[in-house]
Amino acid sequence: MESVVVKISGSLVHPPRLDYLTRLRDVLWGLVDGGFRVAVVVGGGGLARSYIDVLRRAGVSEALLDEMGIESSRLNASLLAKLLYPRSQPYPLASLREVLEVFMTGLIPVSGGFQPGQSTNAVAAVIAEALGARTLLNCLKGVEGVYSDEPSTPGARLLRRLTYRQLEDILVKVSSQRAGSYTLWDMVALSVARRSGLRIVFFDCSDPANIWGALKGEKGSIVEG
């Protein structure tokens, strides 16, 4: 059975919308029914950013802001894990070891962040590497894939296929490594993906059915090689 890791933007989970979340649940269950072994990682999204913004303006350290982001992502992950139950554990997992233990039982492991200084994108890449997954699906909200520049920049082009090096060049231009700001991908996650030869698909998951299209290479941007 092929393993696949699904990284879900926290902005897709919070604020929670029942119709969307049940459709997302059904697609994830459908992947399992279709013969895939699935692991899920959920980001902190707007929930994390709102908390982090207040704390940063209050002068709180980046290390503690990272902790706030982790806790926010785990709350989002807890929501999805409970929704996926009984085909998932009903609580967020907090380490690679816990993910592997749940995965070996045949359930869908659901996690948020693991540790300060590590984005949920990096968590997803590490999990994919550990599970031997070939593909990592990065579910975005309202963004079709990877663009040549910030999507709002005039002249920015959607790139359907690109290499790790091309993604790295784009990240240098558009990414910040501050807590709560891993909007596309980050260098730690990229280094893990590169060393393990992951195929990453960035795509708009405003419609959960797009997960199937991304898995087939019909949606979004594919990064590999």
UniProtKB/Swiss-Prot annotation:
Give the protein's function. Answer: Catalyzes the reversible phosphorylation of UMP to UDP.
Q: Report the sequence similarity comment from the record.
A: Belongs to the UMP kinase family.
Q: Which Gene3D superfamilies match?
A: Acetylglutamate kinase-like (3.40.1160.10)
Q: Does the keyword Nucleotide-binding apply?
A: yes
Q: Name the gene for this chain.
A: pyrH
Q: Name one GO cellular component term.
A: cytoplasm
- A GO biological-process term: 'de novo' CTP biosynthetic process
Q: List the disulfide bonds.
A: none
- What does UniProt list under activity regulation? Inhibited by UTP.
Keyword list, A-Z = ATP-binding, Cytoplasm, Kinase, Nucleotide-binding, Pyrimidine biosynthesis, Transferase
Give the subcellular location.
Cytoplasm
Pfam family for this entry, one: AA_kinase
- Molecular function via GO: ATP binding; UMP kinase activity
NCBIfam families hit by this protein? pyrH_arch
Pathway(s) this gene product operates in, as recorded in its UniProt entry: Pyrimidine metabolism; CTP biosynthesis via de novo pathway; UDP from UMP (UMPK route): step 1/1
InterPro entries per the UniProt record, alphabetical? AceGlu_kinase-like_sf, Asp/Glu/Uridylate_kinase, Uridylate_kinase, Uridylate_kinase_arch/spir
What the entry lists under PANTHER family is as follows:
URIDYLATE KINASE, URIDYLATE KINASE PUMPKIN, CHLOROPLASTIC
Question: Its catalytic activity?
Answer: UMP + ATP = UDP + ADP
The answer to whether UniProt assigns keyword Manganese to this entry is: no
Subunit notes for this chain? Homohexamer.
Binding residues for UMP = 44, 66, 114-120
- According to its UniProt record, the EC number is 2.7.4.22
Q: Return the protein name.
A: Uridylate kinase
Record-annotated residues binding ATP?
Answer: 7-11, 45, 49, 147, 150
